[in-house]
UniProtKB/Swiss-Prot annotation:
The modification Phosphoserine is found at S13. It is an enzyme of class 2 (transferase). Belongs to the glycosyltransferase ALG3 family. It catalyses: an alpha-D-Man-(1->2)-alpha-D-Man-(1->2)-alpha-D-Man-(1->3)-[alpha-D-Man-(1->6)]-beta-D-Man-(1->4)-beta-D-GlcNAc-(1->4)-alpha-D-GlcNAc-diphospho-di-trans,poly-cis-dolichol + a di-trans,poly-cis-dolichyl beta-D-mannosyl phosphate = an alpha-D-Man-(1->2)-alpha-D-Man-(1->2)-alpha-D-Man-(1->3)-[alpha-D-Man-(1->3)-alpha-D-Man-(1->6)]-beta-D-Man-(1->4)-beta-D-GlcNAc-(1->4)-alpha-D-GlcNAc-diphospho-di-trans,poly-cis-dolichol + a di-trans,poly-cis-dolichyl phosphate + H(+). It comes from Homo sapiens (Human). It is found in: Endoplasmic reticulum membrane. It comes from the Eukaryota. Its EC number is 2.4.1.258. One of its GO terms (biological process) is protein glycosylation. One of its GO terms (cellular component) is endoplasmic reticulum membrane. This is Dol-P-Man:Man(5)GlcNAc(2)-PP-Dol alpha-1,3-mannosyltransferase.
Length: 438
C-alpha cells in the first residue's frame, strides 16, 4: 500500500509539472508577439536556440573543412610535459614556445589522451562542440538572471556568427576553454558563491591570460562586497591556485615559468592584427604606442570606477573599509551590478589591446548583447545596435584585415563605450532576492 502511495505521489508530481509546463507554453504562445522582446522569455528562446545550435554545430563539423593552426603545437607542448620536461623554456611546438600558464597544460593533457595523443581530430571537434554548447548554456543563465536583453538578440549571438563557430570547432583554440571557465565563474558570483567564483576565475586565467581583463572589475566587486580585509581571502584563493597549478614548473625553473606563461610584454605579429591594420607596422611595434594604450586603458578603468561603478557619494577609498563601518549602509550586489562591472572591465581592455587576433573574438563576443542592450542610451535604437553588432561581425570575418575593417571595429567599440558612459546607471534595482554570500 505504501508503495502504491509513493507511486501515485510520483505520478502526481509528474502530472503537476507537465501541467505547469503546458500552461507556460500556452501563455508563451498567447503572448508570442512579446516572445522575442520580453527578457522574461529568455530561457524559452535559449532552449530553442540551443537545440538549433546542436544541429548547426555538428553540421559545421561534418561539412566544413577543419583548419590546422595551433592544435598540433598544443599537443607537442603538452607531450613535452608528459615526457618529463618541466622547464618552461624547453617546451615548444611548431608555432613557437609554450606561452600559456599551467592550467592550459593540464586541460590539454586531458585532451591529448582523449584524442589518441592528439591525432583524432574529429573527437577533438566533438569535445569542443560540447564546450561550445556549455558556453551558450552558461551565457544564457547569466542573461536570464540579469533580465535586460530582449531574446531576439540571442539569434545573432548564436546561429549567425560563422567566426565563433570556426574558433570553437574548426580551429580548436584554447581561448574557448578559458572563456567557458570564466562564464562558470560569473555564474558562481551571481549565486553569491564568491570563493568558488574566484577559484574558477583563477582557473580560467591559468588557461589564458586574457581573462585578466576582467580582473579590475572583479577586484572592485570584491572590495565593494567585503572591504579590503574581507577580500584578502578571496584574492588568496586566486593567487594560491596559480601557485599550486604551477608548482611542478616553479620548482624546476621559476623564472622560466613566470617569464613564459605570464609574459605581458610579448610582441604580436602585424600580419595577424584585426584592430590596428590602418597603422604603419613600425608604429604598431613601437613601445611608446604600447605604453600609450596601457595609459588609456588604466585611465578609462579609473574613470569608470570613480564615475560609473562607485555611486555611494563616499570616497572610493571607502571601499577599503569593512562594509559595516561605511557611512552608506552596504547593499547586496545585484546581478546587473556584477555583470555590468565585469563585462565593462573586459571590454575596456579589449578596446585598448595592443593587437587582436581572430581567435580573440570569443573574449567578448558573448558579452556584446549585454553591453549594447542592458544600459541603452536613448539615441541608440534597436536598429543601430544591430548595425553595430553586424559591423563588428563583418570586421572579424574580414581576412586579411584591412584599414577599413579595423577602423570600423574601432568606431563600433567607440559607440559602445560612449553608450556605457552616457547610458542609464548600470546599477538598477535587483529583480531577485539576495542570497547569503559564501
Amino acid at each position: 500500500m505504501a508503495a502504491g502511495l509513493r507511486k501515485r505521489g510520483r505520478s502526481g508530481s509528474a502530472a503537476q509539472a507537465e501541467g505547469l509546463c503546458k500552461q507556460w507554453l500556452q501563455r508563451a504562445w498567447q503572448e508570442r508577439r512579446l516572445l522575442l522582446r520580453e527578457p522574461r522569455y529568455t530561457l524559452l528562446v535559449a532552449a530553442c536556440l540551443c537545440l538549433a545550435e546542436v544541429g548547426i554545430t555538428f553540421w559545421v563539423i561534418h561539412r566544413v573543412a577543419y583548419t590546422e593552426i595551433d592544435w598540433k603545437a598544443y599537443m607537442a607542448e603538452v607531450e613535452g610535459v608528459i615526457n618529463g620536461t618541466y622547464d618552461y623554456t624547453q617546451l615548444q611546438g611548431d608555432t613557437g614556445p609554450l606561452v600559456y600558464p599551467a592550467g592550459f597544460v593540464y586541460i590539454f593533457m586531458g585532451l591529448y589522451y582523449a584524442t589518441s595523443r592528439g591525432t583524432d581530430i574529429r573527437m577533438a571537434q566533438n569535445i569542443f562542440a560540447v564546450l561550445y554548447l556549455a558556453t551558450l548554456l552558461l551565457v544564457f543563465l547569466i542573461y536570464h538572471q540579469t533580465c535586460k536583453v530582449p531574446p531576439f538578440v540571442f539569434f545573432f549571438m548564436c546561429c549567425a556568427s560563422y567566426r565563433v563557430h570556426s574558433i570553437f570547432v574548426l580551429r580548436l583554440f584554447n581561448d574557448p576553454v578559458a572563456m567557458v571557465l570564466l562564464f562558470l565563474s560569473i555564474n558562481l558570483l551571481l549565486a553569491q558563491r564568491w570563493g568558488w567564483g574566484c577559484c574558477f576565475f583563477s582557473l580560467a586565467v591559468s588557461v589564458k591570460m586574457n581573462v585578466l581583463l576582467f580582473a579590475p572589475g572583479l577586484l572592485f566587486l570584491l572590495l565593494t562586497q567585503f572591504g579590503f580585509r574581507g577580500a584578502l581571502p578571496k584574492l588568496g584563493i586566486c593567487a594560491g591556485l596559480q601557485v599550486v597549478l604551477g608548482l611542478p614548473f616553479l620548482l624546476e625553473n621559476p623564472s622560466g615559468y613566470l617569464s613564459r606563461s605570464f609574459d605581458l610584454g610579448r610582441q604580436f605579429l602585424f600580419h595577424w592584427t584585426v584592430n590596428w591594420r590602418f597603422l604603419p607596422e613600425a608604429l604598431f611595434l613601437h613601445r611608446a604606442f604600447h605604453l600609450a594604450l596601457l595609459t588609456a586603458h588604466l585611465t578609462l578603468l579609473l574613470l569608470f570606477a570613480l564615475c560609473r561603478w562607485h555611486r555611494t557619494g563616499e570616497s572610493i577609498l571607502s571601499l577599503l573599509r569593512d562594509p559595516s563601518k561605511r557611512k552608506v549602509p552596504p547593499q547586496p550586489l545585484t546581478p546587473n551590478q556584477i555583470v555590468s562591472t565585469l563585462f565593462t572591465s573586459n571590454f575596456i581592455g579589449i578596446c585598448f589591446s595592443r593587437s587582436l587576433h581572430y581567435q580573440f573574438y570569443v573574449w567578448y563576443f558573448h558579452t556584446l548583447p549585454y553591453l549594447l542592450w542592458a544600459m541603452p542610451a536613448r539615441w541608440l535604437t534597436h536598429l543601430l545596435r544591430l548595425l553595430v553588432l553586424g559591423l563588428i561581425e563583418l570586421s572579424w570575418n574580414t581576412y586579411p584585415s584591412t584599414s577599413c575593417s579595423s577602423a570600423a571595429l574601432h568606431i563600433c567599440h567607440a559607440v559602445i563605450l560612449l553608450q556605457l558612459w552616457l547610458g542609464p546607471q548600470p546599477f538598477p534595482k535587483s529583480t531577485q532576492h539576495s542570497k547569503k554570500a559564501h
